[in-house]
Amino acid sequence: MITVNVDLGERAYPIHIGAGLIGRTDLFAPHITGSSVTIVTNTTVDPLYGDALRAALAPLGKRVSTVVLPDGEAYKNWETLNLIFDGLLTERADRKTTLVALGGGVIGDMTGFAAACYMRGVPFIQVPTTLLSQVDSSVGGKTGINHPLGKNMIGAFYQPQAVIADIGALTTLPDRELAAGVAEVIKTGAIADAAFFDWIEANVDALNRREPAALAHAVKRSCEIKASVVAADEREGGLRAILNFGHTFGHAIEAGLGYGEWLHGEAVGCGMVMAADLSVRLGLLDEASRQRLDAVIAAAHLPVRGPALGDARYMELMRVDKKAEAGAIKFILLKRFGDTLITQAPDEAVFATLAQTTR
């Protein structure tokens, strides 16, 4: 087992990475101080790992309940969030009740948001079961739900007590979900660590084959990088925005097609292709680097052409973005691997990118 620490002073927490961790009672015990625990999971994950988690919690002598939600991005909304509150209130959960998010990014985001809101804040633990959630969404305290007009527009910054990333859970992950997680790994290397990007290029096939050593390194290095960024800029006042490389275009794709049509990581992968194209057009990135990025995204079995939503629709959707200011779209662009720039772009350049990178 490897442990990476997120250094946030009194709110610091560990990220435990390894195989078989869902069954480790000792990893949960230090973070559960109340008399009850509520597991939040979904209809796909509960049959796979719910019993193992409940067995791990049993020796703690706590009252354990489970809320099972429908599976998918399409359910990341108010109605589903209220199912969590319904479960907590039915079980008479109090301020010391610990929520445990067992699932991917949707479950983690909604459980964290429920924890931030219920009785104005209760503790929660992240147990991410997808590669995307292990390398990205479970770390850093971003929680929330989608709105029909924009992704993740309603939420809170609220840190977990711990992240327990069991890479053994990745063996049951569908191929599309695995590729979606690799997209976030690629993003992390591209924005923050050129040497890590080189490693990803050399090992993308090993990641596709789910080789345990490759997965463990990808999760570890991605978490190290994200932990350092979050520690420096917890609430996305500046530096942390670089983690949104590919997300401005990507969120537009998700909202434009309807949540769940493309996986988040698929949209981010394609969004990176689009952002790299725009980076070249603005004279920031060299063509050879753009081609390298496109190639590794394609090798991860991710889409490299965006849907034809139309220029006006893309622009409308990208203006409904957390980075936008006074309606001006801000893009995270690449200067070189490991070096980014947050900037606006002329509409003509964006239109040229859309013409080149969409169907």
Swiss-Prot record:
InterPro entries: Dehydroquinate_synthase (IPR050071), DHQ_synth_AroB (IPR016037), DHQ_synth_fam (IPR030963), DHQS/DOIS_N (IPR030960), DHQS_C (IPR056179)
GO cellular component: cytoplasm
Required co-factors: Co(2+); Zn(2+); NAD(+)
Biological process according to GO: amino acid biosynthetic process; aromatic amino acid family biosynthetic process; chorismate biosynthetic process
Positions contributing to Zn(2+) binding: 184, 247, 264
Catalytic activity: 7-phospho-2-dehydro-3-deoxy-D-arabino-heptonate = 3-dehydroquinate + phosphate
Pfam family of the protein (one): DHQ_synthase
Gene3D superfamilies: 3.40.50.1970, Dehydroquinate synthase-like - alpha domain
SUPFAM superfamilies linked to this entry: Dehydroquinate synthase-like (SSF56796)
Keyword NAD: yes
Keywords, alphabetical: Amino-acid biosynthesis, Aromatic amino acid biosynthesis, Cobalt, Cytoplasm, Lyase, Metal-binding, NAD, Nucleotide-binding, Zinc
GO molecular function: 3-dehydroquinate synthase activity; metal ion binding; nucleotide binding
Location relative to the cell: Cytoplasm
UniProt pathway annotation: Metabolic intermediate biosynthesis; chorismate biosynthesis; chorismate from D-erythrose 4-phosphate and phosphoenolpyruvate: step 2/7
Cofactor note: Binds 1 divalent metal cation per subunit. Can use either Co(2+) or Zn(2+).
Binding-site residues, NAD(+): 71-76, 105-109, 129-130, 142, 151
EC number: 4.2.3.4
Similarity comment: Belongs to the sugar phosphate cyclases superfamily. Dehydroquinate synthase family.
Role summary: Catalyzes the conversion of 3-deoxy-D-arabino-heptulosonate 7-phosphate (DAHP) to dehydroquinate (DHQ).
Protein known as: 3-dehydroquinate synthase
The organism of origin for this protein: Burkholderia ambifaria (strain ATCC BAA-244 / DSM 16087 / CCUG 44356 / LMG 19182 / AMMD)
Gene: aroB
